[in-house]
A protein has these predicted regions:
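Acidic, low-complexity proline/glycine-rich segments
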Residues: 47-64, 138-159, 191, 196
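Active-site-proximal, well-structured secondary-structure segments within enzyme catalytic domains
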Residues: 57, 61-62, 90-93, 100, ...
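A conserved hydrophobic secondary-structure block that centers on an alpha-helix together
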Residues: 73-87, 167-189, 193-206, 220
């Protein structure tokens, strides 16, 4: 639980100093979970629960726990076991580095624009990017979606689209020092080696062990069938959108013209929904649903947190 808190904080209030301390915990946590996963007495004890009279939910938990042990290398011995632990530790470090690079690349890009550049924006969209007397664009997802949806300036849409999709790579305009290519290659190699240690052909086979599908081929077949069924409709809708726009469309045009077409057909804008979903009503509805589903009470309380926008919720059982 403590690791989940640390991981969350590292993502939402990232700083070099916090991340430096967070990275020091990764090998410790990785080794902790590796030791549990390789604990044969614990594994055998849980396997013994198969002979106990359990309900369906309990049987499922036992089954998933046993599978978790087996995917954690509990059956490995000697050097193979040690290598598996080393791979797990290195993967935890590389995964953090990957996320860190994406985050820093995202935060590195900013562009000051004028009000004339933002034709098509409403008051709410302008407020998100107003900084003193300037308007500052960035690659955070709310700003990105607003620009793709409402900005009439096509060249500006193209610029931010290319900046967004090329983050943490060796192309585009974000700093090359955040390029994730080497990190991804190392992750791929280690995942392949990890799968081979467990007697699997590749990491895809490892990944599907804990999913509903039985094999990577089932995933491929599903996706190919999905393409076959959806592609004709996708082409039809693209043709309709291009006919409406009056010219061939690029990726940075799709959200913009989709919104325009929706406004024309339905006389409706996405922002028209906002008055019907005030913040207080949305939270009340969310709390009511959660309380009903899980038999708990939720109460917002005044408590110091890591950011002024964070709300602290007290959770109690109805029992």
């Amino acid at each position: 639980r403590e690791m989940s808190v640390n991981s969350h904080l590292n993502a939402v209030i990232f700083s070099e100093s916090f991340n430096e301390q967070y990275e020091k915990t990764l090998p410790i946590i990785s080794n902790y979970y590796s030791e549990i996963g390789a604990n044969k007495p614990l594994y055998m004890a849980i396997k013994g629960l198969n002979n106990v009279n359990l309900n369906n939910q309990q049987k499922h938990i036992v089954k998933e726990t046993i599978r978790g042990f087996e995917l954690s290398g509990v059956g490995l011995e000697g050097k193979a076991s040690e290598r598996y632990k080393a791979i797990q530790e290195q993967l935890s470090i590389l995964s953090n580095q990957f996320s860190k690079n994406v985050l820093q690349a995202t935060n590195s890009w900013k562009k000051i624009v004028s009000l004339d550049d933002l034709k098509g924006y409403g008051k709410d969209e302008l407020l998100k990017i107003k900084d003193s007397e300037k308007y500052v664009l960035n690659l955070q997802i709310p700003v990105y979606i607003d620009l793709m949806t409402y900005a009439e300036n096509r060249s500006l849409r193209e610029e931010i689209y290319l900046a967004y999709i090329s983050r943490a790579s060796d192309v585009g305009i974000t700093p090359k020092k955040f390029d994730n290519q080497t990190v991804m290659n190392e992750i791929l190699e280690l995942r392949f080696e990890m799968a081979k240690l467990l007697g699997l052909s590749n990491y895809a086979e490892y990944s599907v062990q804990s999913k509903m599908v039985e094999s990577p081929q089932m995933v491929i077949d599903f996706l190919e069938n999905l393409i076959k069924l959806s592609l004709p409709q996708a082409k039809k809708e693209l043709n309709e959108l291009e006919a409406f726009a009056g010219h061939p469309l690029k990726p940075w045009d799709l959200m913009f013209y989709s919104e325009k077409l929706k406004q024309k057909i339905f006389d409706f804008k996405s922002s028209d929904l906002k008055p019907f979903f005030p913040e207080k009503s949305v939270f009340n509805g969310l709390f009511s649903t959660i309380e009903s589903l899980y038999g708990i009470n939720l109460e917002e309380i005044s408590e110091e947190s890591y950011h002024p926008d964070v709300r602290v919720i007290k959770i109690e059982s109805k029992d």
